[in-house]
A protein has these predicted regions:
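Glycine-rich and small/hydrophobic secondary-structure elements
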Residues: 1-5, 62-87, 108-133, 150
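Gly/Pro-rich active-site capping loops and adjacent beta-alpha segments
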Residues: 1-73, 144-210
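Helix-loop-helix junctions that connect adjacent transmembrane helices in secondary transporters/permeases
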Residues: 100-178
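Structural signal for hydrophobic packing residues in well-ordered secondary-structure cores
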Residues: 3-5, 20, 49, 81-88, ...
Length: 210
């Protein structure tokens, strides 16, 4: 990271080395998201570079799973931001407040897209207030030889592929007065079959059994 003395992040340089296993599969796209989902969080960066290498190894081929590469890049960048805050003597919350991308900002690190929807500033403030950050940061002496501390990190992650993975549902009333809800979501432990039926029943003001 490169930053001014008051903590404005001006440059980000990120390198990711990814193990894709025996076959390519998702290798290039997964590693790409480690930069694609981390660098754009910091809207004041004027220079940024993302370099990655994907290597074959004698392991099971890698695939998509929970975060899809974003978590690795975010962990690295957020750790570096915390180190920067410590080096400059600035509260990690404050340094993020000064740098985060806001709604309406153009994001050069995100293909120049305009951020049309973003509540990151409000989310950050809510976390700060609800956990009592000012009372707990940096550490609190418990008086028994132990201390308690708080830390902070940010993340962004979308769901699906833009313009490809889209969601829809159809609701039909049957001759017998019952409803049929048709969805394309697969319940992989998320409970969507139950949850979406509950939502429909609430909106229709009918029992779930209907």
């Amino acid at each position: 990271l490169g930053a001014t003395k008051d903590g404005i992040v001006k440059g980000i340089d990120l390198y990711t080395l990814s193990n894709t296993g025996a076959y390519g599969e998702h290798g290039p796209t997964t590693v790409g998201l480690s930069g694609h989902k981390s660098i754009p969080l910091y809207g004041k960066a004027e220079a940024f570079r993302f370099v990655s290498d994907v290597v074959y190894t004698n392991h099971m081929s890698a695939g998509a799973y929970r975060g899809y590469g974003a978590t690795q890049g975010l962990f690295a960048v957020e750790s570096a931001v915390n180190e920067l805050a410590d080096k400059l003597g600035i509260d990690p919350f404050v340094i993020r407040q000064r740098n985060i991308v806001h709604e309406g900002d153009v994001m050069p690190a995100y293909y120049g897209q305009v951020n049309t929807s973003c509540a990151l500033d409000r989310c950050l403030q809510a976390v700060h207030d609800n956990i009592g950050w000012d009372e707990k940061y940096p550490v609190r002496d418990m008086g028994n030889g132990k201390v308690r501390a708080v830390g902070m990190g940010m993340a962004m992650q979308g769901s699906g592929i833009t313009s490809v993975d889209v969601g829809s549902a159809s609701l039909k009333i049957n001759d017998d007065g019952f409803y049929t809800l048709s969805i394309g979501a697969a319940d992989m432990g998320t409970g969507c079959d139950t949850i979406l039926a509950q939502i429909a029943a609430e909106v229709l003001e009918c029992p779930l059994d209907n």
